[in-house]
Amino acid sequence: MPDTTKHSSAKELNLTLLPGRGLVGPPPAFALAKPWVTRLRPALNLSPAPSFLLGEGGVRGQSLSSLKGQVGAQLRGHRSPSGAGPGISSYASNPAQAGESLQGCLEEALTLVPKARHQETPMFLGATAGMRLLSQKNSSQAEDIFAAVSRVLGQSPLDFWGAELLAGQDEGASGWVTINYVLGLLVKYSFSGEWVQPLEETPVGALDMGGASTQITFVPEGPILDKSTQATFRLYGSEYSVYTHSYLCFGRDQMLTRLLTRLVQSSPTPLVRHPCYHSGYWATLSPAALYESPCVHATPPPDLDQNLTVEGTGNPGACVSAIRGLFNFSSCQGRGHCAFDGVYQPPVQGRFYAFSNFYYTFHFLNLTSKQPLATVNATVWEFCQRPWKQVEASSPGQDRWLRDYCASGLYILTLLLEGYGFSEETWSGIEFHKQAGGTDIGWTLGYMLNLTSMIPAEVPTQGRAESYGVWAAGVVFAALTLVATLGAAAVHLLWPQG
């Protein structure tokens, strides 16, 4: 098995303006049908310089370059900093440390931006599902964390614009924009200095899975009947209407926490048999951490301090049955255009890019080469049936995540096939990718394209990108996105392995 060292964990975003900052510039280049918060845009007069993003699986990052002379902006490269750490929501009990945790990544990011451009380089802090969960559980702790990180970032030489807690719909829509922008399926910047629309190109759908939530976004064949699930973009004179929905608590880490909690609840003894763990695997744990997750609604037992023993049985059939119990499929009985949990969804169609934990799981299982569904299913089941010692021996250095690949693989199949409604025929349209167009896929780039109005909403009368001025040419931005690891992350770190 390949060594998979990066995992997208629970991601953590309403824009908080810093004192004294006003709105600058015309309206944003695109907006949702349920509008995003009002975007800032600076009076840019910047020469090209590197910019950076931080996020994806704790505090991880990438740098981007917006370089295209004085006549446009073209994403050109990326680089990941060496620092990594847990998401800011993990500092709920000590918010000050959330700010301090950013220092290493911030210092490295400063080296990517020329010193002369520091004060002119905008920086944003974004947060998604992990912080959404913390806000539900304890809003005051979430506010304290945002205050702490804002203090630290506000003292940076960069131009910190503020922080935002992104709604699930915005997260999904931003991921869709990222993919289709870097693939050149929305607009392209030509060598002649023009924004041009691709001919007869169909946008691809986006399947994103973090640690706390999962998102599906695509252009359906027919009209979107539930307007609360519709996002509308206007890019370079063309309007796009996409279906998008985010399922909170259906990200990988929270799924694993909910699954384990159900097994603990149904076990008559302190010995919990886990069908998704390999035979021969065992671990002891305190169940208290399970009930700290806002995604777990079960009543805690009176003896929370009593340790439990979890023993793997390596039974993929029983594992699938347990995973199905996390979904409410009966709520869609008799209803057309319904996924699960009573959520409206039109039929899937076209190509899809599956990224984040979709990719990381299938990359580990060597299933990212567009294998047919029968092969994928057989491979996952065979892996689940391997003894733990064999799995350990074939994948050294993977102890932290190794026991969960079976559950993650079967969960992805259940979600895609029984949840979203992919079939053997439509399965071939799913591609599992970490990157698109040489750029790591995620919501952050799409979010910043909207925030900075980098892509024009309308076709200029001159037909040239120069008409947008230097703001569209030299946009240099820096965005901080922070990923929370709740519940299951604590279990991952505290449990002994084997």
Regions found by a protein language model. Give the residues of each.
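Gly/Thr-rich phosphate-binding beta-strand-loop-beta motif of the actin/hexokinase/Hsp70
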Residues: 1-2, 10, 17-19, 35, ...
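Ser/Thr/Pro/Gly-rich low-complexity, intrinsically disordered segments
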Residues: 14-16, 30
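Intrinsic disorder
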Residues: 28-31, 42
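Helical "lid/coupling" subdomains associated with nucleotide-phosphate turnover
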Residues: 63, 81-115, 124, 128-206, ...
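Acidic, polar low-complexity linker/tail segments
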Residues: 77-78
